[in-house]
Amino acid sequence: MNKRDFSELKNSESSEESSLVSSTETVRSSKRNKKFHKNNRQSNSFIISLNFTIRNDDDPFVYMKNPLSEFIKIGNFVYKTKSFVSLDKDYHDDNLDWKISLNRSQYDDVKDFIYDKNRVIVSSFTNEIQSSCFIKVELSTSTHYKFRVTKNELINYIVRTLNGHIVTIDQNIDIHYMGYPMTINIVNIGDDFIGKITGSTDVHFKNIDSNIVVMNQCIDISNKDVSVFLTKCISLNSNHDNNIRFPIIIDKKIINRYVKNTFDDTFTDNDYRTYTCDDIEYTFNIKVIGCNTQTKFKNTYKLLDDSSPIQIKSNTDNVILTSGKKKAKKICFYFQSSNKDSPSDNILFYNDLVDFITSKYNKITCNQSVKYLTGSKEIVLKADFISPHINDNTMYIIDSNTKISFNTDIKSSYFIAHNDKPTEIDTVTFKIKNNASGGLFSLMFGDDDSEKTVIFDSGKLEKTVRSKFPKRTVLKHKASIQYNGVTYQFVVQEIKFKEDSDNKSDNKSDNKSKNHLDKIKKKYTTYGIITSNTNIKFVPAKANKSYVINNSVEQTEISKNPVQELEKYVGGISKELETVVRTLCLSRGILKQEYLARGLRPVKGIILHGPPGTGKTSLSRNLGKILGCEGDRFRLMSGPEIFNKWVGGSESNIRAIFKPAKDAWKKHGDKSPVYMVVIDEIDAMLPSRSGSDGNPVRDSVVNQFLAEMDGLEVFNNLICIGITNRLELLDPATIRSGRFGIHIKIDLPDQEGRVKIFQIHTKKLQELNRLSDDVDISKLAVITEEFSGADIEGMVELASVYSLERLNKLDVINDDVINTHGLVTFEDFTKAAKEINHNKNKSDSTKDNINHMYL
């Protein structure tokens, strides 16, 4: 028997909350209470004052040595009594006759009636009390976790425990049901204040603690009536590398078996349970389809022995559910995320990626991400496509025969190199760009600094790049580097490698392996290294026309045989043009100083005239390449674009043509690099001036151009090439010696020229072995008389399209089919020649009709 000091009990009492009842119910309770006390005063025959002790149990009896009667009354509450002897304990307290034992809930009920420390008035209770048809109770618990109890079983337990006891409203009763502590509070006994519990008394629940889940009936349901969600999946073994182990790809049939094992007994709607297999713990959430959630008591359910599958969905990234499996022949990945802060680490290697995927992932799905760890970075790859594709829920098996590739067309900051060891770089060209950090204001209103001329010293640039740009690099590799306190973006625009064993053919490998390696080399970039012997060049981006790079320290090397170099790109060069090309290159090559010392003036302007399509623009562009005029030092423009609607705007555009060359000449003198400007349709910009009847704006443009080209300011680092179909329309002052003094007619090519043009435009087809054996270029040159270079180029393209159309009609297309049925034949060329002739005749006919209309 647990005895406690009353004063300690009183100090530890917690404040009680009084429940709100309606005014009508308050009046009824008051009347019942007065009636109960009146009857009690008339019938009670014995009243005593006793010391009490408190027990820690849920026994609803009050214990005394010699009970006054079967029931006693303390305050407003009536309790059934038992003798101390029934406790089966030996007591030797002389004052035991004057003591009474209460449990904790009984003490809480009567504590307001305690006086003189720990004494209470006890009276015998002999009134006849009617049996209660029902009682309404509240359930509470002291636990901090949820537990489930069955409604009917709990009611039976309460009735069995309180059978024969008298209860009153607001009485608290402690019970321990299935090991769970609960407190019952009587809130209603019908119309009476007091009642007796019998085996037929019905128990109703009013309020239930949230930690007590009272379940209703158990219902048998089939697998189709439930949905299961896999909410969590964790590893129980800390030694495993979870980044590699997850996500787990598992077939739905296997996970169905796990679910059935997990919910093999009764469960409730929205129940959570765990299942462990192979050190992996799965958490499942089961929901009953069509379950009424707006009920006071939950039903319990049990799955029938059903062979149909359960609807299962994974809500965690750690598990991917699949249906069926298939061996993957080809898988293509793309980069889902990137790290822009580490440009030196953005070069990945094809073989490393393939080895990682095949060794770490033996199965994959369409929607799965692959995490590739390199250094301190995590790179995420995702499957772009899988062949053969069944559906998105299929598990694809990866083995050594699976061909792995990567989509390099999707924009990413990563580069995939086909070679593991870097190849020594002979020459690398960097493009310099503005770092583009001006923000929204610059984007909307422009940046004034972008028009200012910025001159870069190539020597200083080279030192800066060698020290700060990654030595190991690839094409399009970029990094932000400071130069003279300003940050610019340097992009690898072009790379020329030294001859390396990696680029040589391997005679020992079979043709199949060689073809596979060739495809990899074509698709992925080449990994190179910048050494002390690497030649470094710089060109500004097209958007940064005001950037001027001083390459005077290392002059551009001009070929000693420029005509032969030019014939690689242009066919049908005339003798007259050969002479001009040699003169141009001689005055800008290694004999430049000797050329000037003899009093010879470098050629400043050339007019190329002739019918359209004869290659005048192409000739000019390739002539600029031979002279080293690339990037910002080569400008191709159209004559009409020079005109501006604002006063003085056209003249300002003329000055802008000559400004870069003049600025470079002022800084470097005769060591300045060569600039080239090609003006197409120059007759629209420099038309003949017609005195007072002319257009004053056009006349002003001509005057400004002549002043810039041949004015007081001397500079010999600019070559200006004008292109026109109508030489006679040009102003006579522009085509005199010292300005555009050289006039070369580019006419339709002769037969020998057409052969060379065909050789140039069929070069790629020959390299790919896509020309049929019956194709004779000499015969093609014969049947294309009066064809311009543009006509021949269009003819080659059209013939190639014809062969592709034949391929497109076939059901199966592979390398063997292309090599057999995809070759460009002589018939394709003749068909293309007829179509071009037809289009030319149609165009001439239309032109004649238009002339007739005007006449």
UniProtKB/Swiss-Prot annotation:
One example of a Gene Ontology biological process annotation: SNARE complex disassembly
Low complexity bias locations: 17-27
Gene3D superfamilies recorded: 1.10.8.60, P-loop containing nucleotide triphosphate hydrolases
Start-end of Basic and acidic residues biased regions: 1-13
UniProt-annotated stretches for the region Disordered: 1-37
Residue numbers binding ATP: 610-617
One of the record's GO molecular function terms: ATP binding
Swiss-Prot/TrEMBL keywords: ATP-binding, Nucleotide-binding
Stated name of the protein: Putative AAA family ATPase R476
A Pfam family this chain is assigned to: AAA_lid_3
Family listed: Belongs to the AAA ATPase family.
PANTHER family: VESICLE-FUSING ATPASE, VESICULAR-FUSION PROTEIN NSF
Xref: SUPFAM superfamilies: P-loop containing nucleoside triphosphate hydrolases
